[in-house]
Amino acid sequence: MSETHFGFEKVDESEKAGKVAGVFHSVASKYDVMNDLMSGGMHRLWKVFTIAQANVRPGQKVLDIAGGTGDLAKAFAKQAGPTGEVWLTDINESMLRVGRDRLLNKGVVTPVALCDAERIPFPDNYFDLVTVAFGLRNMTHKDAALAEMRRVIKPGGKVMVLEFSKVWKPLEKFYDVYSFKVLPWLGERVAGDAPSYRYLAESIRMHPDQGSLVRMMEQVGLEQVEYFNLTAGVVALHVGRKY
């Protein structure tokens, strides 16, 4: 049996999805509040930058994978308009329910679906854009998920990955203290769940750095892959294209 990482813990590949699901069932109801607290609201600016780089136009088709509470899908649905098609998807029922309800409360009606990024239930060459924000690091087979994302975009389309990455070296010690001391403390105080936020910190450290993710995207056939460091490399936006 093959092993993978759940944070720093080594687990059998067959166990990871269930463990990650447990984390997100636990944090779903406090997800937005905790995002604001953990990032000082910066996650909103990271998403604004991603939306600007996506440049969705009326009539386009967009797939938002691991879409969580729907921040990106909401913006894309407005940009694509009534002639477009924007799907909010997540592998986790609790997160998808929160995202769907949040969109409806904002007056945004768009299709939602449970979706495993390693087995995307859409035909080849269907979407103009596929996005995944803060979800890739939780996937068991990242290469398989990226290959699936490439499969479903049209020639000329883009895959965009917004994810925690490798912080600039002078900030590493401070970032470690914040990640392994402050985040679990916030998780306990606000969400009553320190272990889930300890996993968050560990999963960030185990995720490929900027250059490694570029190579991973290129290996599945994405081209002209580039990345943008945000907030000193705390987060990076990777963009790959299909021709």
Swiss-Prot record:
GO BP term, pick one: aerobic respiration
Pathway: Quinol/quinone metabolism; menaquinone biosynthesis; menaquinol from 1,4-dihydroxy-2-naphthoate: step 2/2; Cofactor biosynthesis; ubiquinone biosynthesis
GO terms assigned for molecular function: 2-methoxy-6-polyprenyl-1,4-benzoquinol methyltransferase activity; demethylmenaquinone methyltransferase activity
Pfam family, one: Ubie_methyltran
Keyword Transmembrane annotated: no
Catalytic activity, reaction form: a 2-demethylmenaquinol + S-adenosyl-L-methionine = a menaquinol + S-adenosyl-L-homocysteine + H(+); a 2-methoxy-6-(all-trans-polyprenyl)benzene-1,4-diol + S-adenosyl-L-methionine = a 5-methoxy-2-methyl-3-(all-trans-polyprenyl)benzene-1,4-diol + S-adenosyl-L-homocysteine + H(+)
Keywords annotated in UniProt: Menaquinone biosynthesis, Methyltransferase, S-adenosyl-L-methionine, Transferase, Ubiquinone biosynthesis
Record EC number: 2.1.1.163, 2.1.1.201
Top-level class of the enzyme under EC nomenclature: transferase
Chain sites annotated for binding S-adenosyl-L-methionine: T69, D90, D116, A117
InterPro entries according to UniProt: SAM-dependent_MTases_sf, UbiE/COQ5_MeTrFase, UbiE/COQ5_MeTrFase_CS
Described purpose of this protein according to its UniProt entry: Methyltransferase required for the conversion of demethylmenaquinol (DMKH2) to menaquinol (MKH2) and the conversion of 2-polyprenyl-6-methoxy-1,4-benzoquinol (DDMQH2) to 2-polyprenyl-3-methyl-6-methoxy-1,4-benzoquinol (DMQH2).
HAMAP family in the record: MenG_UbiE_methyltr (MF_01813)
NCBIfam families: MenG_MenH_UbiE (TIGR01934), PRK00216.1-1 (NF001240)
Family the UniProt entry places it in: Belongs to the class I-like SAM-binding methyltransferase superfamily. MenG/UbiE family.
Listed name of the protein: Ubiquinone/menaquinone biosynthesis C-methyltransferase UbiE
Organism: Cupriavidus metallidurans (strain ATCC 43123 / DSM 2839 / NBRC 102507 / CH34) (Ralstonia metallidurans)
Lineage of source species: Bacteria, Pseudomonadati, Pseudomonadota, Betaproteobacteria, Burkholderiales
